[in-house]
Amino acid sequence: MPEQAQQGEQSVKRRRVTRACDECRKKKVKCDGQQPCIHCTVYSYECTYKKPTKRTQNSGNSGVLTLGNVTTGPSSSTVVAAAASNPNKLLSNIKTERAILPGASTIPASNNPSKPRKYKTKSTRLQSKIDRYKQIFDEVFPQLPDIDNLDIPVFLQIFHNFKRDSQSFLDDTVKEYTLIVNDSSSPIQPVLSSNSKNSTPDEFLPNMKSDSNSASSNREQDSVDTYSNIPVGREIKIILPPKAIALQFVKSTWEHCCVLLRFYHRPSFIRQLDELYETDPNNYTSKQMQFLPLCYAAIAVGALFSKSIVSNDSSREKFLQDEGYKYFIAARKLIDITNARDLNSIQAILMLIIFLQCSARLSTCYTYIGVAMRSALRAGFHRKLSPNSGFSPIEIEMRKRLFYTIYKLDVYINAMLGLPRSISPDDFDQTLPLDLSDENITEVAYLPENQHSVLSSTGISNEHTKLFLILNEIISELYPIKKTSNIISHETVTSLELKLRNWLDSLPKELIPNAENIDPEYERANRLLHLSFLHVQIILYRPFIHYLSRNMNAENVDPLCYRRARNSIAVARTVIKLAKEMVSNNLLTGSYWYACYTIFYSVAGLLFYIHEAQLPDKDSAREYYDILKDAETGRSVLIQLKDSSMAASRTYNLLNQIFEKLNSKTIQLTALHSSPSNESAFLVTNNSSALKPHLGDSLQPPVFFSSQDTKNSFSLAKSEESTNDYAMANYLNNTPISENPLNEAQQQDQVSQGTTNMSNERDPNNFLSIDIRLDNNGQSNILDATDDVFIRNDGDIPTNSAFDFSSSKSNASNNSNPDTINNNYNNVSGKNNNNNNITNNSNNNHNNNNNDNNNNNNNNNNNNNNNNNSGNSSNNNNNNNNNKNNNDFGIKIDNNSPSYEGFPQLQIPLSQDNLNIEDKEEMSPNIEIKNEQNMTDSNDILGVFDQLDAQLFGKYLPLNYPSE
């Protein structure tokens, strides 16, 4: 036991330092022998070991291996980099050094064997290097055999074949390792070169890369264990960029990234930045050291937003990204996020959050937002200060700005991830910041008289804050984590729509969406705020999008729900149009992560419509192709953005997977509806029963809507101040959602006269009324119930929407061709549901009508065998067209089959090997759709969009699908 205790005491003793660095030797102070040493770290000296020791200078024995002649071995980062960039070299090094090792002998430490030296032998150093190479090789290629049993030529040949795919992963690994580990062993050295202040951006960018590569040096480490003992928390050595470059990056942060997030005071920031550059780094005060991480973080974000989506200089773009990561790590190492109390520290955390968002690192971003929120709450930023609080005007306004910025980021990131918000509006009473420019807020007073009613950047941020307060309500009302029921009240949604309407009407003229002649100073803010508004609308209408599914039973569909589902598609199309405009005007880059998300979900929503659409007439087909074109436009926008940021790239890759999974269905639908003028294309199935409501049936509310809520929604829909009067989707659009079924000449006449009494000419029994809104340009926005549903035009017989049961009743009783369809939806209480199947007046009333449908589909619609109407193929086409035109959705709902999250399973006919697609005008080729493929495709579609919900709204949010 005493011997073990003595050995333990010896093991914890500090290792004797064999050599001090040049600076410590010069100043004759204790050195810890590290690279860099603690003394050089504290005083920002350059830590070198260049000067030879006196022992080396005086020694005449060339056989002694002294420290002055020790060759620096490779650091771990160097070895990892070598493994990733050139595995040939890694393998050859291991083989070569193992070949040398057996013949290596110990170098004599002295001519006198009685005084052995304790220096390393060449054999030991080689073994250490081999062990380190082998450790990395085993980690990079864990499934390969031992290096001695590896056929290196074969392996290298295979590696080169797959190099393109594997290189990206290895490069990313090396890059991340270099940023986190290698830089952490270097000290902070914010030293300005003699010509830094006069450097220009063009002169600086080419040279900065080489400076950063040579910023740190490495010493030989005895072994992997010795290397792991190096302090990881050591700060990073970074040379501040020239002032011109720093100002350029900071300006990019303010004017591109933080347009809607205002949490800084520009004059104060510039003043502290000037002091930083004018002060010797050795003489930095504690206040300047507190400002340094904020400066680094602002530069890091500015580097990301300096990347251009149109630049062809890949090396410059990669350099900017690397610079962003470098300064981000510098800021992160300098700040203690667990003890951030001052304004500069919390601002720095906010900048780090923005950087993480733009880099698509949402998990870390979520953690940092929580830290920032707790720091702000601990500092009392959420409480309103009294006039005699003792804080200066700048401090008071900064507290407001910081709190509301953190609050907005918290609401946004939790909406993205489907997680609870950190704070409720009932928990704070802080007022919004004053709408004053920074120059009009000083340390001693406010200067509102100098504002002259000019909209400030803080005023822009305030409008964004008001919008996010509404977003918070939407999430609370429509996406509660703890639900009391599955009921969504129409009144609740209507009140949220009206709040958005009031917010929109209260915007200053510079921020009104689609306003013309906008001052260039406000153009970017206008477009970004418009995009945020559309993003809020997407979340508002998202619970209704499943009403566009062909699996929905028409008799249980609430028209107001369907209308809002259509609004979600209209909003998505507006997002695509706006994003395309912003990209073309260089107002949007891939670093706007929330913009990429909004575009992504918009395209995904359009894809859902494309694969669930019913096209009963030419107008619907024309709209279908417009939406298909918009979806492809949105995808092309993401392609332009994906190379400018990691966030955009990840978003595009996820969307591309959806495109690939749904590609087969797109091909089928495109072939089916290849021409907007094709009115006779139809799909023959044995389940083509007309899902029209029975003449005596009344509209039944969906399962998750209460009867009282439905009544309220209907009464609201009829009134002038209803939600129909306010269509958020069309409020910003200059074009209708789809073609209006009314006579075009009548529409043009009424629009030209500026009348709004079109709803008075409608059937009073129709639930939805028409609105015409004239915008500032004199253009009309026509809003109709039939804008939000599919329109069917059966020749001279006008029919209204699928939910206008009065018109359906008239159409059913006055059908001009009674031989066409004689089963007017026989689903009456007490009757067999199988009677709903169309048999085309066949005498076969058996429950299984597969034979009839087989005959209908046989020989290109020559269904004369079981059809009492012995007309020619043209009559058969007319019959099938009328069958389709009187079919609300054309798909039977099977409530007993499995479903995806409440979506009823699509019942596919099993009696036919394929489904023939006929085209009267031969505008599209005939294709065959296998039943099994169609079944699988339907499952894939619903499964993909269920995954999409999980990706975008988190697993904690309800999908709000109707339960059967």
Swiss-Prot record:
<keyword id="KW-0238">DNA-binding</keyword>
<dbReference type="GO" id="GO:0008270">
    <property type="term" value="F:zinc ion binding"/>
</dbReference>
<dbReference type="InterPro" id="IPR001138">
    <property type="entry name" value="Zn2Cys6_DnaBD"/>
</dbReference>
<dbReference type="InterPro" id="IPR036864">
    <property type="entry name" value="Zn2-C6_fun-type_DNA-bd_sf"/>
</dbReference>
<dbReference type="InterPro" id="IPR007219">
    <property type="entry name" value="Transcription_factor_dom_fun"/>
</dbReference>
<keyword id="KW-0346">Stress response</keyword>
<dbReference type="GO" id="GO:0006351">
    <property type="term" value="P:DNA-templated transcription"/>
</dbReference>
<feature type="modified residue" description="Phosphoserine; by ATM or ATR">
    <location>
        <position position="166"/>
    </location>
</feature>
<dbReference type="GO" id="GO:0000981">
    <property type="term" value="F:DNA-binding transcription factor activity, RNA polymerase II-specific"/>
</dbReference>
<feature type="modified residue" description="Phosphoserine">
    <location>
        <position position="186"/>
    </location>
</feature>
<feature type="region of interest" description="Disordered">
    <location>
        <begin position="190"/>
        <end position="225"/>
    </location>
</feature>
<keyword id="KW-0597">Phosphoprotein</keyword>
<comment type="similarity">
    <text>Belongs to the ASG1 family.</text>
</comment>
<dbReference type="Pfam" id="PF04082">
    <property type="entry name" value="Fungal_trans"/>
</dbReference>
<dbReference type="Pfam" id="PF00172">
    <property type="entry name" value="Zn_clus"/>
</dbReference>
<feature type="modified residue" description="Phosphoserine">
    <location>
        <position position="963"/>
    </location>
</feature>
<feature type="compositionally biased region" description="Polar residues">
    <location>
        <begin position="209"/>
        <end position="225"/>
    </location>
</feature>
<keyword id="KW-0479">Metal-binding</keyword>
<feature type="compositionally biased region" description="Low complexity">
    <location>
        <begin position="800"/>
        <end position="896"/>
    </location>
</feature>
<keyword id="KW-0539">Nucleus</keyword>
<protein>
    <recommendedName>
        <fullName>Activator of stress genes 1</fullName>
    </recommendedName>
</protein>
<feature type="compositionally biased region" description="Polar residues">
    <location>
        <begin position="733"/>
        <end position="759"/>
    </location>
</feature>
<keyword id="KW-0805">Transcription regulation</keyword>
<feature type="region of interest" description="Disordered">
    <location>
        <begin position="800"/>
        <end position="900"/>
    </location>
</feature>
<dbReference type="GO" id="GO:0045944">
    <property type="term" value="P:positive regulation of transcription by RNA polymerase II"/>
</dbReference>
<dbReference type="GO" id="GO:0005634">
    <property type="term" value="C:nucleus"/>
</dbReference>
<feature type="compositionally biased region" description="Polar residues">
    <location>
        <begin position="190"/>
        <end position="201"/>
    </location>
</feature>
<feature type="region of interest" description="Disordered">
    <location>
        <begin position="733"/>
        <end position="764"/>
    </location>
</feature>
<feature type="DNA-binding region" description="Zn(2)-C6 fungal-type">
    <location>
        <begin position="21"/>
        <end position="47"/>
    </location>
</feature>
<feature type="region of interest" description="Disordered">
    <location>
        <begin position="104"/>
        <end position="125"/>
    </location>
</feature>
<comment type="function">
    <text>Probable transcription factor involved in the stress response.</text>
</comment>
<dbReference type="InterPro" id="IPR051711">
    <property type="entry name" value="Stress_Response_Reg"/>
</dbReference>
<keyword id="KW-0862">Zinc</keyword>
<keyword id="KW-0804">Transcription</keyword>
<dbReference type="GO" id="GO:0043565">
    <property type="term" value="F:sequence-specific DNA binding"/>
</dbReference>
